[in-house]
Amino acid sequence: MSSPLRTMISRLSLFRPAHTRYAAAAHFHATSNCSGARVAVVLSGCGVFDGTEIHEASAILVHLSRGGAEVQMFAPDVSQMHVIDHGKGQPSETESRNVLSESARIARGNITDLAKLSASNHDAIIFPGGFGAAKNLSTFAIDGMDCEVNKEVERVLKDFHKAGKPIGLCCISPVLAAKVLPGVDVTVGHEEEQGGKWPYAGTTQTITALGAKHTVKDVTEAHVDQKNKVVTTPAFMCDTKLHLIFDGIGAMVRDVLKLSGK
C-alpha cells in the first residue's frame, strides 16, 4: 500500500474500533455540551425511493444543530420493503437491505434501534420523509388508508403525544400521524396538483379519509397543530427548488424546538 493511501485511510479512522470511531461521528448531529432540546430523529433507510429522503434528513440536522439541540438518531431494525436502484428507478430483484443498517449511512454510524427509544429521554421527535416512511415505517405506499404502521413507530408516536412532547414530520411522513393520532391536523402542502407542482396532492384525500384534518400550506411554511403539538411541512411533496424545501424544514424545526420549551 502506498504511503499517501495509508495516510488517507489512517485519517479516515477505518481501522479503529467502532466504539471510538463513532464517537467522533456523533458531532455530525449533536452539539457538544448542549443544554438545549433533546431531539430524537427517526430514519427509514437511506435514499428517497426506498428509505429516508437524504436532503430532508440533512436539513433537519442542520437546523437542529443551529437551534442548539442534542440529537440522537433511531431506525427500526427491520428489512426494507424492497431495494430500488436509484439510477434506474427500478426495484432490484436480488437485493435485500436492513432499515437500521441503511439509516446508519446518514447517521455516520451513530444509530440506535428504534425499540430502545423512550419518550422520557427526549423533549421532541422528528420524522424526515422519503418513501421509506410509506414503505418501511408503514405500508402506506401499498395499502393507503388501510395501511399498518410499524409497531415501534406507532408506539413512539403515541408515547410522545401522550407526554405532550412535540412531534415534527415532513413530506409524506405526516400520514403516520394521521393514521396513529385521531383527529390530528397536518399539512402535506396543497390539495390540487397545480400543473405538477404538487404531484402528490391526492395524499390529502387519504389524510382526511383517516379522520385527520389537512391544512393547506406552501413549501416554505410549517403548520402547527397546537392541541396535539404536531408540526408538519410539505418538503418534497412539492416539486420545487431545494433551498425552499430547506427553508420549510427550518420553519418546522424552529416550531418543534419552541414547543419543546427548550
Swiss-Prot record:
InterPro entries of this UniProt entry?
Class_I_gatase-like (IPR029062)
Extract the transit peptide range from the record: 1-8
Highest taxon, organism lineage:
Eukaryota
| Keywords tagged on the record | Mitochondrion, Transit peptide
Where does it localize? Mitochondrion
List, alphabetically, the CDD domains matched: GATase1_ES1
GO cellular component assignments: mitochondrion
Its family?
Belongs to the GATD3 family.
Q: What is this protein called?
A: Glutamine amidotransferase-like class 1 domain-containing protein 3, mitochondrial
- The source organism is Danio rerio (Zebrafish)
